Every structure is written in C-alpha cells, then in structure tokens.
Amino acid sequence: MCDRSLYRSGYVGSLLNLQSPDSFYFPNLRANGSQLAALPTISYPRSSIPWTCPSPCAAQPQGHAFGGAAQPYLPGSVPISISSNSNKECLEENSKYYAHDASSKQEERCRQRQSFANDPTITHAANLKPAKYDHSSLPRSLHGSAALFEVNSCTSSLKEDIKNSVNLNLTVQPAAVQSCLRPSVQDGLPWCPTQGRSRKKRKPYTKQQIAELENEFLLNEFINRQKRKELSNRLNLSDQQVKIWFQNRRMKKKRVVMREQALSMY
C-alpha cells in the first residue's frame, strides 16, 4: 500500500507548482491575524492614499492586523479594521465630521440670507410703499399735524378723482351708445339699418274681425283684389293683413285635412 502522505497538499503542490492557500491572501498575514516575521511588510506611501480618516482612526497602533499599512478609500464604503473598538470610533468620528460639515454649511447659508436682508441697497417688494405715506425719515415732532394734513389732502384728492372718473363714465357712456344707435345722416346711409328702422308691433285681430273673415272664407277661400279692399276698409285692416290672414287660414285647413286622412288610414 502506498503512503497517504504523498497525497498531501504540500507534496502535490510542490510537484504541480501550486501555491499554498495562505498565498492567495495577504502575504504577510495568517488566518489567526498574526504577522510572519520572515516576510517583508507591505507599506503604502501616505501621499498615494486619496482619503484618510480623522486622527483617532489614522493613528492606529502597529500591533493591529495591517500594521503600518493604510487601506485605500473606495467610494460608498467605510474604512474596515479588524478591531471592533477602533471601527466604532471611526464611525462616530465620521458621523461627527459630516454633521459638523452640514451644520457649518447651514450657518453659512443663514449668514448669507441675513446679509442679503440687511443690505440697504436692495429693496424688497414687501417694503415698497408710496413716497407720500413714508414718514420714517421725518423726526417724531413732524409726525403730528403736518403728516395728518398731508394724508387728509391725499385722501380728499383721491376721492375727488374717483368722483370725477365716475361722473365722466356716466356722462360719456350713454352719449357714445346713442351716437352708435343713431343713423349717420352725413354719410348718406344709416350705419346699421336694422337698428334705425323700428319694427311695428303686432296687433291681434279682434273677435268681430275674425268672425267677418271666417264668414268670407267659408264663402270663398280665394278672394280677388277688389273683395280684399272692401274687407280691409270695412274691418279697418290693411290689404296686407287681409291677404296674410287668408293664406294662413288656407294652410290651417290643409293641415286639418291631411290629419283627418292620416287618421282614417289607421
């Protein structure tokens, strides 16, 4: 039987030129975190590191896992160390650092706003007032009768201006409307003939007139011009009114006949 010691990883690795598992990690570290004395330590120059943590985190003792070497900064990550106490201190310092930075930025913004508000050269919209009512520059002794007199005079002048404008609107507006409604005689033709010509009001027929027209319609549906003139003179109607009444009466009779025919079919 063959010896099983020949199949060990150290012997097979030496034949196949394979490195030991410790070589895949940091060459100066072991699994238990101790440092090899024979191998040289890895050291990075401090200028090559883009970011270093604050003073308690940067000044770590040499007895830790990484020794004097510092870990490069990766964006979105937190510096990692084996000791839990130093990691907690680092996180606390980072939070303090960023909180202090944010508070300092807010203080700067508040100072800028205060300086902007206190700047006398800049006038705000809320502080804009008419010059007549601004008495802040006057001494207190002049805020008595002179200021009241000026305010009263301003209010009275404003009231007079409002009254005059209202009176002008009331007097000018109807005149303008009447001038638009009246026909323009100078031009020869009315500006709007429909407005210039007044429409006659409809006069309803009296019962006596309707009775006379109905009797004449029963005798003859179509009347001549002579008969129409006689009816108009007798009933005190115009020739056009008599003509229109007979036309409407014939249409009414036609509708009645068509309705009776439709009902008889059903």
Curated annotation (Swiss-Prot):
DNA-binding region per Swiss-Prot/TrEMBL record: 198-257
Any single Pfam family the record assigns to this protein: Homeodomain
Gene3D superfamilies (UniProt xref): Homeodomain-like
One example of a Gene Ontology biological process annotation: skeletal system development
One GO cellular component, as annotated: transcription regulator complex
Cited InterPro entries: HD (IPR001356), HD_metazoa (IPR020479), Homeobox_CS (IPR017970), Homeodomain-like_sf (IPR009057)
Secretion signal, residue range per the UniProt entry: none
Entry keyword set: Developmental protein, DNA-binding, Homeobox, Nucleus, Transcription, Transcription regulation
MF terms (GO), sorted A to Z: DNA-binding transcription factor activity, RNA polymerase II-specific; sequence-specific double-stranded DNA binding
TM regions (residue ranges): none
Compartments reported by the entry: Nucleus
Tissues expressing the protein: Expressed primarily in limb buds.
Keyword Transcription regulation recorded: yes
Family note: Belongs to the Abd-B homeobox family.
Subunit structure: Interacts with MAF and MAFB.
UniProt function note: Sequence-specific transcription factor which is part of a developmental regulatory system that provides cells with specific positional identities on the anterior-posterior axis.
Protein name, per record: Homeobox protein Hox-D12
Biological classification of the source: Eukaryota, Metazoa, Chordata, Craniata, Vertebrata
